[in-house]
């Protein structure tokens, strides 16, 4: 079984070697942990965002720049492609670890989750485990972690602090915009497993595109814009060893199947009293899905791109 941590390490090493060209800053904490600043104090950039995203997916996907053009709205976009959908998205990329140490808080995603089993149920459902000696965690935060945070993460992962790598980017940064849009395939797999309770190991290949949100001036607004890029601008193509349930599952898969669909995410969040648990989890999904049943050769589609909500979200 491939290790998502060991597989992502060459990408991390490439980021360290090319730090100046990527506009990222590398520092070693006193306990030996390596921190790669991709947008807190460093500028970051598109290439750093693409690498950040590939690291987050355990090196089991390619993330490339493309273009989104729909009904007069033109934006840069990402194209995500993986031949290991369940592992790259749910075992690695999913933002399933709330890292809180003292006053520090970050959403943790990436390969290190597989060592810390955050959350354990996900790994049981997709039958995946990792036992690497190195841990790589991607943190969505506007603050850089210190030694206490690193010690906590290393301890949870069962690795020495000097074998821990922490990549950090705020939501309101170019790397933040890129890496959230690169979760377009992940949202499809997430909804299949967590909401529709479908066996995601049946998904054999996946690719998807989503526009990259204009960078906002604060993390709150950025959270809304980046989510909208997937909910209203994302398209995912899944290749599935299907069953009799698949046609009905596809109809429920896109974001439009949710009762919360149809308005910018920040409005949804506001109406939920800023409580994520009051939001219908079914809205966290791509706008449009195309599913090829490998067992029958049939193809099913559902959902559509909603440019009007994207424009409202971006203030256009």
From Swiss-Prot:
Main localisation: cytoplasm
Protein name: Methenyltetrahydromethanopterin cyclohydrolase
Function noted in UniProt: Catalyzes the reversible interconversion of 5-formyl-H(4)MPT to methenyl-H(4)MPT(+).
UniProt entry keywords in alphabetical sequence: Cytoplasm, Hydrolase, Methanogenesis, One-carbon metabolism
E.C. code: 3.5.4.27
InterPro entries xref list: METHMP_CycHdrlase
Compartment(s) of residence: Cytoplasm
Keyword Cytoplasm among record annotations: yes
Record text on subunit structure and interactions: Homotrimer.
SUPFAM superfamilies according to UniProt: Methenyltetrahydromethanopterin cyclohydrolase
Organism: Methanopyrus kandleri (strain AV19 / DSM 6324 / JCM 9639 / NBRC 100938)
EC primary class: hydrolase
Family: Belongs to the MCH family.
NCBIfam families per UniProt: one_C_mch
Gene Ontology CC terms: cytoplasm
Pathway membership, UniProt: One-carbon metabolism; methanogenesis from CO(2); 5,10-methenyl-5,6,7,8-tetrahydromethanopterin from CO(2): step 3/3
MF GO annotations: methenyltetrahydromethanopterin cyclohydrolase activity
An individual GO BP term: methanogenesis, from carbon dioxide
Catalytic activity: 5,10-methenyl-5,6,7,8-tetrahydromethanopterin + H2O = N(5)-formyl-5,6,7,8-tetrahydromethanopterin + H(+)
């Amino acid at each position: 079984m491939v290790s998502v941590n060991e597989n992502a390490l060459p990408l991390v090493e490439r980021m360290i070697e090319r730090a100046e060209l990527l506009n990222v800053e590398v520092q070693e904490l006193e306990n030996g942990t390596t921190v790669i600043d991709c947008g807190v104090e460093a500028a970051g950039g598109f290439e750093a965002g693409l690498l950040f995203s590939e690291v987050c997916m355990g090196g089991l996907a390619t993330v490339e720049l493309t273009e989104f053009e729909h009904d007069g709205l033109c934006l840069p976009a990402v194209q995500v492609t993986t031949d290991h959908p369940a592992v790259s998205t749910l075992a690695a990329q999913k933002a399933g670890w709330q890292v809180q140490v003292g006053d520090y808080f970050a959403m943790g995603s990436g390969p290190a989750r597989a060592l810390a089993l955050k959350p354990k149920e996900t790994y049981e459902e997709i039958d995946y485990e990792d036992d690497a000696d190195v841990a790589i965690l991607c943190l969505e935060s506007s603050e850089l972690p210190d030694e206490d945070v690193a010690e906590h993460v290393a301890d949870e992962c069962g690795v020495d602090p000097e074998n821990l790598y922490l990549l950090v980017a705020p939501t309101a940064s170019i790397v933040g915009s890129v890496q959230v849009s690169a979760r377009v395939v992940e949202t499809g797999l997430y909804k299949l497993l967590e909401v529709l309770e479908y066996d995601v190991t049946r998904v054999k290949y996946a690719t998807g595109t989503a526009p990259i949100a204009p960078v906002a001036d604060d993390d709150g607004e950025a959270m809304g814009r980046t989510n909208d890029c997937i909910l209203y601008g994302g398209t995912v193509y899944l290749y599935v060893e299907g069953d009799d349930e698949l046609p009905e599952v596809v109809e429920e898969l896109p974001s439009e199947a949710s009762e919360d669909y149809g308005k910018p995410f920040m409005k949804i969040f506001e109406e939920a009293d800023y409580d994520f648990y009051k939001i219908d989890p079914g809205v966290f999904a791509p706008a449009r899905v195309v599913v090829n049943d490998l067992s029958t050769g049939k193809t099913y589609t559902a959902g559509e791109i909603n440019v009007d909500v994207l424009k409202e979200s971006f203030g256009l």
